[in-house]
Each structure stands twice: as C-alpha cells, then as structure tokens.
Amino acid sequence: MLRKTYKYASFQLMLIFLISFFAFSATSVTSSASAVAKNNKLHGGIEIGSRGVKGTAINFSRKGSGYDVKIIYTEVINTSIMKVKDNKFTPEALQETAEAVNKMFARMQQEYQVPVEQIYIVGSSGLRSDNKPDLVSAVTKATGKPMSFLTVEMEVQLSIAGTIPRRREDETKPLDEREASMLLDIGSGNTKGGYQLSGTGPTDEFVTMGIPFGTVSFTNEASKLRKVEADLSSFALDALLISQHTLNEQLRKEVEKKPGLLSRNRIYLSGGIVWAMATLVHPENRKAFVSLTTDDITLFHYRARNDVNALLNPDLSFIADELKRNEIKKDVESVKATFSPKNIIAGAEILNAVNSEFKLQGKNIWFARYGHLSWILSYVRGQAEKQLLTAERSTTSALK
C-alpha cells in the first residue's frame, strides 16, 4: 500500500527558481493535459531514492540558441524502501516502491501524454542493499521499462547543476555562483557533495565526495546497538556514541583526500533533513534559498537530542498572517509525516558532523529548498537535450 503522497503545487515559485540554475527561458507552467498534448517534446523522469519515489515531467524545445523548458508535473511519494532486513529490501517495500513508480509512470502517459520511450527510471546512489536486482525486476515487471542507477559522482554533478544557479536573482554579486560555491547533500541513504572547478574547458570538471550514511541509513545503523528497540533518549545516546567513527572520521578522510572541499565559502545544503531543520527552526522563511548559520545547526542538534517532540511541534503563534500560518502548519506536518523522531535525531547528528568536518563556521550557508528535485530534473533535461541534438544533426545531414 502506498504511503501518503505529496504534490508540490507551488509550481510558479519553483519555476522562478529553476530558471536561474538551468540557464534557460521558461515562461509558464501548463497544467492541463489538453494543452500539453499539442507538444511532442515531452520527457519524464522517475527517481527511486532512499526515502521514496519522485517524478517530474518537462516540455523541452529549442528557443533560439538555447532551450525552453516548462515543468508540467512533479510528485513525491514516500515509501519504506530503506526499511531493510538483513541488508535486503523487503518484499513489501519492493512491491510498494514498484506501485509508486507505476503510478507515476501511468500518470505521465495518461494525464500528460509523455511518450513511454521518453520516460526514464533511475535509482539514487543512496540505495544500498544486497538485492538491488530484485528492485530492478519489480520495477521492470510493473512498467515494462528498464531502470539504471547513478553513481555518487554522477548524482553530485547533476545535483550541482540543478541546485546551484550560475547567477542568483536575489544577489548582486558579479560572480559565477557555481564556480564559487559547494553543495552538501544529506540524503536518506548517503551524504555527498562537491564543487565545480573553475575553468574554460569544453567540459565541466567536478570534485565530489560521499559517505554511505544518510538520515535513514544512519538511523538503521544506530538502531543496531541494542537487541530491543531503544526509547528516544537511549537512541540519541547511541547515535552520539557511534557518530565520531561512523560519520566524522569518514567525512574527515574525504576532506583529507580532497582538501579543496574546505576552500569554498559559499555552501548550499540540500536534503530532507536540511528541509526539516529550516522548516522547524525558521518556519516563517519560505524562500527558495534560506540563509542558515552554524548556530542554527547547533540549536537543531541540541533540541533533537534533548526534546525532539517539542522540536517537531514549534510554536507558530508569532506568525500573524493566518493564511501563512496555516501553510506553515502543513509544512510542519509534512516533516512529521516524512521523518520519525529517530530520523530527526540521526539527521541532526549528520548535520553536526558536516558542520564540524567542513568547518562551516563563518561561511555563507543556504538551504536550497528545491534541491530535492535537482538531479532528476537535470537528468531528464540532459536526456531531452541529447535527443534534440541528435534529431537536429540528422536533419542537417539529410539536407546536405
């Protein structure tokens, strides 16, 4: 049975954000299937991650020397795929995930007329288990489509392209934001990040890193310390006890191998636990880029360890606008539906380790609100661009 589904309805705000980092012109979002049906430049992507399944569809076409991209559909369905047993996806989780994928797969075709051959199904690098082929089989059986998996390096590169804009619309600094910044993404299955090297070569080069622990997988790791399920206080102690070896030491080794990871002073944080922190610590700030400080991370870590239930139920009475307050309440409820209290505690430990090992004190830090869709959108756009360029070359050759 599928768990609660969240649709991201605020397409206009998201579109404004996406315009800057894809460096293309997008003028409007068409939500009606009848309008979309007239355009055959439709592509869709389905991402299977450690927290669930994300789907997106775009209308992609040539516009002058660039491209015109319109986002026509996004959806997120949380699943229990990372509730592994003996380091294997359970049959129930496999079925649940395959059903979620098939639901999006069918919707893209039926409601948005995306051609079946232009829907791509991709697994996140954070999916770790001994029976990945069983997931591929379940998805292929449900959809008739093959699926592939990204490496950490590929996912970081796509996420950087999709999260960090070349230019910030809300800033006046005359710099290439992507060549001055670094991305750190705390996913459910792993923690990864990196930066794009400055240069004028024909292709972009990146420095990437990753460790195999994210919010859910670290929750699972800390839960192994006791034969019986721990209460929240005991779990917080267990997570703290293993964090130095499991998190800090592994992050430190990555930094030692690639010291340039400490050189960037503009840091973009993404991932579900960062969204949770921004929502709970700064509920009133709903911008595309939310400014954060290391004090925010320290406070979040302290409150998660000492009174996670109070943290998950913030006082919103200071927000005078009732409409805005009700919208924020929905955001808070989404956090609670997405993460268990133990997930919040585990994620706070990862944030604390990232803060320490990447020496974030004194750096400019932002939460990238729409980073959760960044790599799948980048992937779909890349596939659409590749197909369009191939078609254009074929047309040019035929005319010679």
Residues of each region from the PLM?
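N-terminal secretory signal peptides that target proteins for export/translocation
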Residues: 1-8
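Composition-driven detection of intrinsically disordered, low-complexity segments
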Residues: 9-12, 75
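Bacterial N-terminal signal peptides
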Residues: 12-23
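Bacterial Sec-dependent signal peptides at the C-terminal "C-region" and cleavage site
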Residues: 21-37
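Gly/Thr-rich phosphate-binding beta-strand-loop-beta motif of the actin/hexokinase/Hsp70
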Residues: 36-69, 170, 174-206, 272
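Conserved phosphate-binding loops in N-terminal lobes of ATP-dependent enzymes
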Residues: 39-146
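Helical "lid/coupling" subdomains associated with nucleotide-phosphate turnover
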Residues: 84-102, 106, 112-113, 129-131, ...
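Glycine-rich beta-strand-to-loop/alpha-helix junction loops that act as flexible
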Residues: 123-127, 186-191, 267-274
